[in-house]
Amino acid sequence: MAGDVNNEVNSKKRQGDTLAKERLLGLAEKIYNQFEEEVIPSVSLPSRTKANIEYSDESDVWVYGDRESERSAKTVKGAFQLLKTTYATDFLINEHLAHNRGSTLRELYYISEGWDYAKFKEQAESDRLIEDLELLTSLQREYFHMRPEEDGATMFGPIEISELTKRGARNIHCQKDVGEGGYQIPFNVENIEFKNHDASMIIAIETGGMYARLMENGFDEAYNAILVHLKGQPARSTRRIIKRMNEELEIPVAVFTDGDPWSYRIYASVAYGAIKSAHLSEFMATPAARFLGLQPSDIVEYELSTDKLTEQDISALRSELSDPRFESEYWKEQIQLQLDIGKKAEQQAFAGKGLDFVTEVYLPNRLKELGMV
């Protein structure tokens, strides 16, 4: 059985490598042909701005619209961008794909030190270029064997998986076979196969403190819940595994964050995608995900300990009123309420009501409101 899983995953990997090579070579060929035809080389990309985000009725997520920006050798800046694009493309084809190697985003920045004029000035520049290649090839960076620098998040709950590692496939029960930290989500979750589960819901949690509180209080057992620690703004792998569990296993998802504008964006990135990676929304976003809390109305109802909104918080909330991801009446009412009360609260504020309050009172009540229990 393990051998069959290995063969299947290895076959998919070879197919992915072949596709990535074809797409990257196609991009290089396009630029080369423009030189041959004595046309100033250029490539077009979707504009990565809030104004170019639109709702897809087909996939129920927010994607890029028709507005485009151009990378053209008409300008010195554009010429350097294309030069760096060709160097990176060559590296990915002849180092990563040809030799089954991989690099982190940080390593790519340092690797470019040997690229003469194509050297990146800062890592943000190399990160954007990989995003450009994703847009130009319609493939995720994992196809190029690019890894994120950050660790994946963790999850804990009643689900058994099979993960293909360099040492072969291994079966892991994410309650019985892991420590208190939970199962470490790998950067490429396509190497995971779901085996069995008894889960009734997935609770995606922003902070480590609340993740640990729910585990200590036995919430995963009481509600057959898979707990996922988002670690703040969630990594791609975290969003992808949530989407896969929701779509493939039909497990409902709720997102539990702090009660501030930055946390609402964490929910939005899980449910609808992020602006700078809207090209990946259909691959990573879970539009069925519900916002559990912490709501501004909870601050009022439960008289939670709060902090005063900063000017940056107020500006962010006002910006969200025009963000297409928050255009529903529910979000408009909650955001306006928060602006009116001028307060924000953390998840841990529930501890002021007792260590069991969040799992015995707040979450059961809120889950009933959402129709999840």
UniProtKB/Swiss-Prot annotation:
Residues 15-153 form the Topo IIA-type catalytic domain. Gene3D superfamilies: 3.40.1360.10, Winged helix-like DNA-binding domain superfamily/Winged helix DNA-binding domain (1.10.10.10). It is an enzyme of class 5 (isomerase). GO terms for molecular function: ATP binding; DNA binding; DNA topoisomerase type II (double strand cut, ATP-hydrolyzing) activity; magnesium ion binding. The keyword Secreted does not apply. Its EC number is 5.6.2.2. Belongs to the TOP6A family. This is Type 2 DNA topoisomerase 6 subunit A. The lineage of its organism: Archaea, Methanobacteriati, Methanobacteriota, Stenosarchaea group, Methanomicrobia.
